[in-house]
Amino acid sequence: MSDHNATPAAQDENHIIAERREKLAQWRQAGRAFPNDFSRENTAGKLDEVYGDKEPEALEASPVEVRVAGRVMLKRVMGKASFITIQDLSGRIQLYVQRDGVGEDVYADFKHWDIGDIVGCVGTLFKTKTGELTVKASEIRLLTKSLRPLPDKFHGLTDVEQKYRQRYLDLIMSEQTRFTFVARSRMVQSIRNYMINHGFLEVETPMMHPIPGGAAAKPFVTHHNALDMELFLRIAPELYLKRLVVGGLEKVFEVNRNFRNEGLSPRHNPEFTMMEFYEAYADYRSLMNFTEGLIRQAAREALGAESFVYQGRELDLSKPFHRLTIVQAIRKYHPGFSEAQLADAEWVKEKIQAFGEKVKPGGLGSLQLQLFEACAEAELWEPTFIIDYPVEVSPLARASDSNPEITERFELFIVGREIANGFSELNDPEDQAARFLAQAQAKEAGDEEAMYYDADYIRALEFGLPPTGGCGIGIDRLVMLLTDSASIRDVILFPQMRPE
């Protein structure tokens, strides 16, 4: 295929790739391509931790032999001796390669290796004149030939779309990206440990549901050929987890993916990770305390601190989290709004429109929630539990004993974003059936996010669900918070993208 229409940069890249393929062909012919018999015993970061402060004389007096491997990121060839810097997950280390140290034939080959190649090296540690910890190579081998050139080391990946599409390249080039996903892994592990240490059992529930449920969202639809039935990728695991509590598994949790056929935004990806947990004989108040402790623990494990900077602004998780009702939150940021005005549905509708939002159908509680989302939610920088949600927008939550119009429900907001949603579970099967019926009628009227009627879940409740509290925590949004990431795509390894 002709390259005459390619840009100069593309032509240069194609030329580099062709040269590297030719080198690979020569190594194949020599029987040295892609060996798999080099064992690494040391990592760059650990060597720096143990020997980085050693005096040069100490390393010379007691030679330390090491076996390292990694990707070549820098290379300086200087006649009979050269320096290269290799990178592994833990960091970087410099290698000193001499013709007299590795042999004339190996050194001749080495001079043709490229940035991006993966090498293995055996040698001893020493310090250069500038004090840099370095491996003096006695053996060095090409383990993997890189056929494509890496981006310019000074600019890295400047195309954000390319970062997300080619995450493998982003991970090679960006220390911040590597930090983000290592921190994510540590955070998820700390959450698992926290749950297990508090007596919870980790479980797995179906990803394909005959009836979508557990959240107000539009599902992805698929088809099972053998059973000839329509199935839905799960939007939430809630109803299955509560079935397990009915069965006697009194403290359960699951960390897994949910799928919602909705829009893309800096806070939304169609495929995302949630941690949901349910505890018998707990209510929403005890769950708020538990969630507060869990999030602090996650911060300590990921960052080593409970106080940090997010997007240039200080955030302190060590202080007690605030607790406000929807009306209290609105009035905190708009003290001119009176309680009487907020109890007037027509007045609330006018205010929703005044903030530039469309009014969705609903009663007073739904309207107050819409106004809160329009004028107060984004202001909740410090960790804040918004409590006592209206029944009409909480079809799975238990109604308050003191006010049947509201539920024992909370949502946790940090930096103006919802991080968690929890409530005392509705365990009255007749009340739940009536709410499912109302949701089904709303769906028939055109509400795509209204829930389906789940007869099997009602049957499970009829066997008896003990008083139970449940909560879902958005893992991706929590990682965004703890890694100072502005977009959810920065914390998902392979986010959903439009076709190239």
From Swiss-Prot:
Subunit structure comment from the entry: Homodimer.
Family classification: Belongs to the class-II aminoacyl-tRNA synthetase family.
Gene field: lysS
Pfam hit, one: tRNA_anti-codon
EC number: 6.1.1.6
Broad enzyme group: ligase
Cellular compartments annotated: Cytoplasm
Matching InterPro entries: Aa-tRNA-synt_II (IPR004364), aa-tRNA-synth_II (IPR006195), aa-tRNA-synth_II/BPL/LPL (IPR045864), Lys-tRNA-ligase_II (IPR002313), Lys-tRNA-ligase_II_N (IPR044136), Lys-tRNA-synth_II_C (IPR018149), NA-bd_OB-fold (IPR012340), NA-bd_OB_tRNA (IPR004365)
Cellular component terms per the entry's GO annotation: cytosol
Domain of life: Bacteria
Catalytic activity: tRNA(Lys) + L-lysine + ATP = L-lysyl-tRNA(Lys) + AMP + diphosphate
GO biological process, one term: lysyl-tRNA aminoacylation
Binding-site positions, Mg(2+) 2: 418
UniProt-listed HAMAP family: Lys_tRNA_synth_class2
Annotated GO MF terms: ATP binding; lysine-tRNA ligase activity; magnesium ion binding; tRNA binding
List of residues binding Mg(2+) 1: 411, 418
Required co-factors: Mg(2+)
This protein's UniProt keywords: Aminoacyl-tRNA synthetase, ATP-binding, Cytoplasm, Ligase, Magnesium, Metal-binding, Nucleotide-binding, Protein biosynthesis
Protein name, per record: Lysine--tRNA ligase
Cross-referenced SUPFAM superfamilies: Class II aaRS and biotin synthetases (SSF55681), Nucleic acid-binding proteins (SSF50249)
The record's free-text note on cofactor binding: Binds 3 Mg(2+) ions per subunit.
UniProt-listed NCBIfam families: lysS_bact, PRK00484.1
